[in-house]
Amino acid sequence: MKRVVLAALPLALVVGGCGGGGPTTSPEPSPDSGRRSSPGTPAGSASGRTGSAKATPGKKIAAMNLRLRDAAWANDVARARRLIRQGADVNAKDDTVQSAYLIATSEGYLDLLRLTLRAGARINDKDSWNGTGLIRAAERGHGLVVGDLLQAGIDRDHVNRIGYQAIHEAVWLGEDTASYATTVRVLAAGGARLTDRSPSTGLTPLEMAHERGFGGLESILRSVTTADRPTDPEAALLRAAADGDADAVAVALRAGADIEARDEHDRTALLLAATYDHVPVAKVLVAMGADPDAFDDRHDTPWLVTGVTGSVAMLETLLPADPDLAVRNRFGGLSPIPASERGHVAYVRRVVQTGVDIDHVNDLGWTALLEAVILGDGGRRHQEIVRILLAAGADRAIADRDGVTPLRHAEQRGYHEIAALLRR
């Protein structure tokens, strides 16, 4: 009982979280941020009167840095990019010790984070809690951000001023959910120390999970801290990916496995995970930088396979890895084509929103619309896919190599409902 009380005190202390928060409404000036103008007062003006002295270069930069932080809070990547090009500093902080870079880490803004890293973010910069971006991201369960930071070389085991490392915050201040499960696995895969006791609680991450009643996180931590180091990390990685064992994937990566290792069919771990729809495995691999466009000996990639399986969950998992939507399979097709043929309604509904070319013609001379008609069964699933494709702007006039249009194919097959859709 005594240990529970000791452990609970720091949790109450930081119940609001150690990082992030939100934009302050009326911050005081700080050395590198400049003074925020009052409402209605032009930036760089001391009084709000027009005709005041021209702003100094320092004040202009301070105002620009303020606008950059505002853009960061709004996750307005385009505006942030413009400001950075104009000279705004991704490391400039306000009086609450927030910078555009640190905001990206706590809020889980992956594209913004990548922008700030390219713009020279100080990877080990600290917030007001003396915490790194890794600690902030781990606390919020942002596994993808955690993965990018680990790949960028951030200090994996820094202790903030209340005695927590990133792994401690992910468990003690987190939740027993899928996002935190991914975060813990990614920290393990990236080599974070997993058995250190928090100076403030006296607990290891495993003990923290037990105290919080987080059975899922406790199981993960027990698995990754007690597993034997694999003698062949690459073989262990591929086997774990095929089996859907996300904990074993983390252990293999922790042991130094090449994330792009191939099996006898040139399949990577991510391709195996996509093929068998092992989403938790894919989440760890994507966070750690696995390639969504790696071809196997059948000219399949992790992304292309989603069109065959129809897994929307896997599609969503792979999108942050920035897959090439124009990559073609061995038939010269893009992922919407096999999905349309196979009647994967939910997948087609989602993939048409990605910007993929829905009028792409494969080596057989067929578009997704043609395949939905020619290789479909004319039933409700294929009717809905035709409806989705047309609503997304698919060109119903594109004919096959024999000059036969989708409408003519539908009429020849007696698919009256589909023909009616195509006549509209």
Where are these regions (language model features)?
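C-terminal motif of bacterial Sec signal peptides marking the signal peptidase cleavage site
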Residues: 15-17
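Bacterial signal peptide processing site
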Residues: 19-22
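Ankyrin repeat boundary/linker residues
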Residues: 61, 94, 127, 160, ...
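Start-of-repeat signature of ankyrin repeats
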Residues: 64, 97, 130, 163, ...
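Ankyrin repeat A-helix N-terminal signature
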Residues: 70-75, 103-109, 136-142, 169-180, ...
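Ankyrin repeat structural motif
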Residues: 76-84, 109-117, 142-150, 176-189, ...
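Ankyrin-repeat inter-repeat connecting loop/turn
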Residues: 90, 123, 156, 194-195, ...
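Leucine-rich solenoid repeat scaffolds
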Residues: 194-226, 396-424
